[in-house]
Amino acid sequence: MNIRRKYGVHGRMVLNHEKIGGEKVIYTLESPWNPNKDEPNGILGLSCVAPGNYNISIEQSPLNKRYYPFLVNESKNVCLKSKVKAHDKTGHAFVDYESFNSLEIYGRFILCGTSYKFDPKGYYAPVYGEEAVSIIKAYIEATGDKSLTISWI
């Protein structure tokens, strides 16, 4: 699986398998700040999810009992549930925009959907997110592919 970014926080993932009905596009919106050595508070408009390779782990939220796909790469200090070092992050969960409540998941998040719309707050928001999360989980179940690469177009 790949998420290809064209702009700082928007990406898209193309999945293709007969078990999910052929080719499906998942649109993503990542948290728009990226801390680095020059800007410790983050750069607004640059994703907090670093480009690179990640593993996906399907985990149950202890708060709402729903299952979410989480990105994990401990070499990038993105751990699943526990932080080893103070600057570690917990995994990034794929969640739906429509019913998203940051208090119902642990860790960080990537909003996803099978389409998108312009939000009056000034960004394109993924919509039909529950469908997107279901497609991601079905794709992983059908293929066994639990790896994801995030890169720039």
Enumerate the predicted regions with their spans.
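Cell wall/extracellular polymer interaction/catalysis modules
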Residues: M1-V127, E131-K146, I153
